[in-house]
């Protein structure tokens, strides 16, 4: 079984040997060393294979971002499909050097056990805005299908701030008001990282250096929240999955104010950290945000050949 597993992994990794754009490995780690780490798995340990015959597979689909764009909701909804096996945690393989340096063998161990017919999906929102990641993923599998969920850039900035704020509050640490982070000397603080993460055009250009647009499906995060079923149908078609998810899998929870999931008669909602109210922001500051993102948004629309209902 170990030999069969290794053969499958090497088949996925094979493009590394012939492609003209090799990955940018961590310091001191060469491309062949990455392959070697896949080849050398412990003998007779059963690693990568369960007693029921299921195996761990490298992902055929990755949700690459964007942070605070709705990636968790997308993964949970996609997991309703019986032919999808999703990694439970964010792996951060391609963007964290301490993980990437351990090679594809380590990455494989982070994947869920799945049947041969299932599609393995991994989600790490930081991938979209990490410069090295597109080339590294392409080196692993140039035909992989990528999912990118985006929302209104200004709203994404506010959600980004809200998450960090709550993280600080839980640790009883102070955190400045959003106005102090967004503004500097009467102007937008362009060094604020949350702003950069919402410049979708710049990040998308980097991905299109390595993947054709047809390999990247953009999910409208705002529509996914308002009416999830049509957006998930598009994802099913993009991934060439049979249409198994239906409208009855979603119901609107009036208490929470957003859609929850119904799977095999069991209801479940996203974690309470999802859908938090954003802080009150001066309308003039919001106008500055909308103005700042206006031109980058137009460039993004032209780049991907579609528009979104953003400010």
Curated annotation (Swiss-Prot):
Phenotype upon changing residue 123 to A: Abolishes the enzymatic activity
Effect of residue 67 to E/A: Abolishes the enzymatic activity
Effect of residue 274 to A: Strongly decrease the enzymatic activity
Biological process terms in GO annotation: glycosaminoglycan biosynthetic process; heparan sulfate proteoglycan biosynthetic process
Keywords: Disulfide bond, Glycoprotein, Golgi apparatus, Signal, Transferase
Residues binding 3'-phosphoadenylyl sulfate, per UniProt: 68-72, 151, 159, 259, 274-278
PANTHER family according to UniProt: HEPARAN SULFATE GLUCOSAMINE 3-O-SULFOTRANSFERASE 1, HEPARAN SULFATE SULFOTRANSFERASE
Protein name stated in the entry: Heparan sulfate glucosamine 3-O-sulfotransferase 1
Gene from which this protein is expressed: Hs3st1
């Amino acid at each position: 079984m170990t030999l069969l597993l290794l053969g499958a992994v090497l088949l996925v990794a094979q493009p590394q040997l012939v492609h003209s754009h090799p990955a940018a490995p961590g310091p001191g780690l060469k491309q062949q060393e990455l392959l070697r780490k896949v080849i050398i798995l412990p003998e007779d340990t059963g690693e990568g294979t369960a007693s029921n015959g299921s195996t761990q597979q490298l992902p055929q689909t990755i949700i690459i971002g964007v942070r605070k764009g709705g990636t968790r909701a997308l993964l949970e909804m996609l997991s309703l499909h019986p032919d999808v096996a999703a990694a439970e945690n964010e792996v951060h393989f391609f963007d964290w050097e301490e993980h990437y340096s351990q090679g594809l063998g380590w990455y494989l161990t982070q994947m869920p056990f799945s049947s041969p017919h299932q599609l393995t999906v991994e989600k790490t929102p930081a991938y979209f805005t990490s410069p090295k990641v597109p080339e590294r993923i392409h080196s692993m599998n140039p035909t992989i299908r990528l999912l990118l969920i985006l929302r209104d850039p200004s709203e994404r900035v506010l959600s980004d701030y809200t998450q960090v704020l709550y993280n600080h509050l839980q640790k009883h640490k102070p955190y400045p008001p959003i106005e102090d982070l967004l503004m500097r000397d009467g102007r937008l603080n362009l060094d604020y990282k949350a702003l950069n993460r919402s410049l979708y055009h710049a990040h998308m250009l980097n991905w299109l250096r390595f993947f054709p647009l047809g390999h990247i499906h953009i999910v409208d995060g705002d529509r996914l929240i308002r009416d999830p079923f049509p957006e998930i149908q598009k994802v099913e078609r993009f991934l060439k999955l049979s249409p198994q998810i239906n409208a009855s899998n979603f119901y609107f929870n009036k208490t929470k104010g957003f859609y929850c999931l119904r799977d095999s008669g069991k209801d479940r909602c996203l974690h309470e950290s999802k859908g938090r109210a954003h802080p009150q922001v001066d309308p003039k500051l919001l106008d500055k945000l909308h103005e700042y993102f206006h031109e980058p948004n137009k460039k993004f629309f032209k780049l991907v050949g579609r528009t979104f209902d953003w400010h």
